C-alpha cells in the first residue's frame, strides 16, 4: 500500500515513532522513464536531476544537487561536503548523479532519522540539465520512504510546461518526530526563480557538471 498525493497542495503526515522508522534511513527517490535503448544511445532520452533546498532549525540553509557537488566537490555519506552529510549536520546526503545511465532506481536523497528534529523544511526539486523540457515523456515520480510507514508518492503527471525546473514536493519537519509531505509541482525558470517563490534567499552564479 502507498499514499498518493493527487493534487497540488495535498499532504500527508508521517509519524516516525511508528515501528522501525526512527532507526531506518528516510529515502527520497526520484525515478523516471529513461526510454528504450535507442533513445539512450542517440540522446533522445530525458535526463532528470534530483535536488533539494533545506533549512535547519538553527537557521542554516543550503541546497544539494548534481551541479553543487560536481567538479570533485562531493563526498561520501560520512563526510561533510556539497553533497551533504548523513552522519553529521545537515543529516541529508545525495547518493549521486545518475547522469542518464539508465539505472532503474533514478536518484536518491537520504535523510538520517537522528536529525529529523534538527531539520525544519526541505523542498524537493528536479530539473532537466540538457535538452528540451519534455516532462510528459518522463513519467517522473518522487517516493518518500520511511520504514514502518506507507510510502508517500508524488507523481508529476502529464505535464507540458516548457520550463525546465520543477519543485515537486515540500517536507515539513514538525520537531515531534513527524514529517508532513506536501505536493507542489510548480515550474520555474531555474534555481533562482524557484528560490524566490519559496523564500530561500540564495545568490546564484552559472555552473556546469562538466
What are these regions (language model features)?
Residues 1-121, 125-210:
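Intrinsic-disorder/low-complexity signal
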Amino acid at each position: 500500500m502507498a499514499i498518493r498525493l493527487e493534487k497540488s497542495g495535498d499532504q500527508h503526515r508521517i509519524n516516525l515513532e511508528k515501528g522501525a522508522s526512527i532507526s531506518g534511513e528516510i529515502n527520497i527517490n526520484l525515478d523516471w522513464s529513461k526510454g528504450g535503448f535507442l533513445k539512450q544511445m542517440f540522446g533522445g532520452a530525458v535526463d532528470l536531476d534530483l535536488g533539494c533546498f533545506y533549512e535547519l532549525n538553527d537557521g542554516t540553509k543550503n541546497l544539494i544537487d548534481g551541479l553543487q557537488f560536481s567538479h570533485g566537490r562531493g563526498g561520501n555519506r560520512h563526510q561533510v561536503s556539497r553533497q551533504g552529510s548523513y552522519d553529521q549536520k545537515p543529516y541529508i546526503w545525495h547518493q549521486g548523479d545518475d547522469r542518464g545511465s539508465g539505472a532503474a532506481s533514478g536518484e536518491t536523497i537520504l535523510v538520517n532519522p537522528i536529525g529529523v528534529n534538527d531539520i525544519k523544511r526541505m523542498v524537493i526539486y528536479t530539473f532537466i540539465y540538457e535538452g528540451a523540457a519534455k516532462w510528459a515523456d518522463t513519467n517522473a515520480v518522487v517516493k518518500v520512504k520511511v520504514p514502518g510507514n506507507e510510502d508517500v508518492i508524488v507523481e508529476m503527471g502529464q505535464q507540458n510546461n516548457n520550463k525546465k525546473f520543477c519543485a515537486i514536493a515540500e517536507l515539513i519537519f514538525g520537531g515531534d518526530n513527524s514529517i508532513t509531505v506536501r505536493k507542489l509541482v510548480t515550474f520555474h525558470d531555474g534555481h533562482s526563480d524557484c528560490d524566490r517563490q519559496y523564500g530561500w534567499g540564495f545568490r546564484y552564479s552559472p555552473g556546469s557538471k562538466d
